[in-house]
């Protein structure tokens, strides 16, 4: 039998106006990094692949329907090592405290879907749009 999270608990976990939650834990200017290689099996560790790009995100806004969204992220130049983007990590503003990670793909099958090619050359620009995080509740 599955564990079900109530909507009120979902809102509190992600950070509604009454509780700090994940939104406050993430902070004002979190970093999103894209890497080559697979997502690390250890949720506490960074990927073993090569760092492709680092993006500074805007603070996540107020929760709406269990979702918080960061809009107007910066676009950063790719590091000297190009490659195939395959995973990502979200870090606090200190650029070292890991919050979560996932896989990346071009069309489907990834936790983040890229609009452009997953293969990028050295010195290319990887553009970042909005990032939404959703905390599911009930049977979602």
Which residues fall in each region the model found?
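Small cysteine-rich, disulfide-bonded extracellular modules of the LU/uPAR three-finger superfamily
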Residues: 1-88, 92-140
